[in-house]
């Protein structure tokens, strides 16, 4: 099965140019393709993973991806999908973000020891040295104002306002494609559905600049959720690929909590499971949704891909411990992950009567309530029900000398830090 047939099965083609010529090109030779990533933060998030994994799919099919980091365009700001002007970052900030993103991209693509190695590029290398006269004379003259105003990325901002800075973004991205076409023989640009206008503008610039040019564009569909909320966001914010921003446990939980209505679609979009494996999981969703086999497969595949096998095993262990209440089996680092958002209090490492600990840590509102909680069996210390009113929390209750986990009731956890 060819790459296009695989993408069609997965629902990964939104729009593409010249279907027949594009398919023939992919069948005939190893094609260089690119996708751009503007450094707007010091980490990629799962929304970025979608096109990154497209580059990976093409590489696995024998093609040569170029991961383009927008060190230049990142200082301008892409108006696509934005209702208001972006806040511009400083040159130093963009440079820092660029390096961070380059490091993350290297985790998903093979840059050496393969016949079709990926390439990393930074558009600041050519945009940073571009003078205004050359830009307007050699590039700008190829873009008619009416043509640009008709593009969705610009048209959608005309009423609310768009600066010349963001208005020029389309031209800069088009120049990226031309530069990569001329110097790297890059024939294909891929991007999100909101990039169609920028991609076709780049194709038009190549057509005007290069005789008999053959270049192509492909966009992937917007990732949606059946409940109408935005994909990739939680109450805690974006789901990042950096484990310091989003722990592997949180990352795993994000995928595990996928709605039954979305899980098969996400298996197709994000994983590298075979068609047969996905169809089998789809069958299990229909026949036994309560087993959540598809969600477990999705969480495992994505966490392993981004954070590795060891982090996946940790995430599964933390999830199982929280579900069963067997939290004493967790290490300190696993507790840090699993209890990141749990109410916590700092205490000195001294022996303390449990009743006093409950009140002083505001786990129980009063001593009377604390006594009731203990005698009623509502208090657990490191997963063990504790009903003795004279129980003293000692060194033996401090996991690795750092934590004591108190549970009140079925699911209300509190973390004591030492």
From Swiss-Prot:
The keyword Acyltransferase does not apply. It is an enzyme of class 6 (ligase). It is found in: Cytoplasm. ATP binds at residue 233. Residues 352-418 form the S4 RNA-binding domain. One of its GO terms (biological process) is tRNA aminoacylation. Keywords: Aminoacyl-tRNA synthetase, ATP-binding, Cytoplasm, Ligase, Nucleotide-binding, Protein biosynthesis, RNA-binding. InterPro entries: aa-tRNA-synth_I_CS (IPR001412), aa-tRNA-synth_Ic (IPR002305), Rossmann-like_a/b/a_fold (IPR014729), S4_RNA-bd (IPR002942), S4_RNA-bd_sf (IPR036986), SYY-like_C (IPR054608), Tyr-tRNA-ligase (IPR002307), Tyr-tRNA-ligase_bac-type (IPR024088). L-tyrosine binds at residues 34, 169, 173. A motif ('HIGH' region) lies at residues 39-48. A motif ('KMSKS' region) lies at residues 230-234. GO terms for molecular function: ATP binding; RNA binding; tyrosine-tRNA ligase activity. Its main location: cytoplasm. It catalyses: tRNA(Tyr) + L-tyrosine + ATP = L-tyrosyl-tRNA(Tyr) + AMP + diphosphate + H(+). Its EC number is 6.1.1.1. GO terms for cellular component: cytosol. The keyword Aminoacyl-tRNA synthetase applies. Catalyzes the attachment of tyrosine to tRNA(Tyr) in a two-step reaction: tyrosine is first activated by ATP to form Tyr-AMP and then transferred to the acceptor end of tRNA(Tyr). Homodimer. This is Tyrosine--tRNA ligase 1. It comes from Bacillus cereus (strain ATCC 14579 / DSM 31 / CCUG 7414 / JCM 2152 / NBRC 15305 / NCIMB 9373 / NCTC 2599 / NRRL B-3711). The lineage of its organism: Bacteria, Bacillati, Bacillota, Bacilli, Bacillales.
């Amino acid at each position: 099965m060819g790459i296009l047939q695989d993408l069609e099965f997965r629902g990964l083609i939104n729009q593409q140019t010249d279907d027949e010529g594009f398919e023939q090109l992919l069948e005939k030779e190893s094609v260089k393709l690119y996708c751009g990533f503007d450094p707007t933060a010091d980490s990629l998030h799962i929304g970025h993973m979608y096109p990154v994994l497209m580059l990976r799919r093409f590489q696995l099919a024998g093609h040569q991806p170029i991961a383009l980091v927008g060190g230049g365009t990142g200082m301008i700001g892409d108006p696509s999908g934005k209702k208001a002007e972006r806040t511009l970052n400083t040159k130093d900030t963009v440079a820092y973000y660029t390096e961070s993103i380059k490091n993350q991209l290297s985790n998903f693509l093979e840059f050496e020891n393969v016949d079709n190695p990926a390439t990393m590029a930074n558009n600041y290398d050519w945009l940073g040295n571009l003078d205004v006269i050359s830009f307007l004379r050699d590039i700008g003259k190829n873009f008619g104002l009416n043509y640009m105003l008709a593009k969705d990325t610009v048209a959608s901002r005309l009423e609310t306002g768009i600066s010349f800075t963001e208005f020029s973004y389309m031209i800069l991205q088009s120049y990226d494609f031309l530069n990569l076409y001329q110097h790297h023989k890059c024939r294909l640009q891929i991007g999100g559905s909101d990039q169609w206008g920028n991609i076709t503008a780049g194709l038009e610039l190549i057509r005007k600049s290069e005789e008999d040019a053959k270049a192509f564009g492909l966009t992937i569909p917007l990732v949606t959720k059946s409940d109408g909320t935005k994909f990739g966001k939680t109450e805690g914010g974006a789901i990042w690929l950096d484990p310091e921003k989003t722990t592997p446990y949180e990352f795993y939980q994000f995928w595990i909590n996928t709605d039954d209505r979305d899980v098969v679609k996400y298996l197709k979009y994000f994983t590298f499971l075979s068609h047969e494996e996905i169809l089998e999981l789809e069958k299990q969703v229909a026949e036994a949704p309560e087993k959540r086999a598809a969600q477990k497969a999705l969480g495992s595949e994505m966490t392993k891909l981004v954070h590795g096998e060891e982090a996946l095993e940790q995430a599964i262990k933390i999830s199982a411990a929280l579900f069963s209440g067997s939290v004493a089996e967790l290490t300190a680092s696993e507790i840090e992950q699993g209890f990141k958002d749990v109410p916590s209090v700092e205490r000195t490492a001294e022996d303390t009567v449990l009743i006093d600990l409950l009140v002083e840590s505001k786990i129980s509102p009063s001593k009377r309530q604390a006594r009731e909680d203990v005698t009623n069996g509502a208090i657990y210390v490191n997963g063990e029900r504790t009903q003795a009113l004279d129980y003293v929390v000692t060194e033996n209750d401090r996991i690795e000398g750092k934590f004591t986990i108190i549970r009140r009731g079925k699911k209300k956890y509190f973390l004591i830090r030492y």
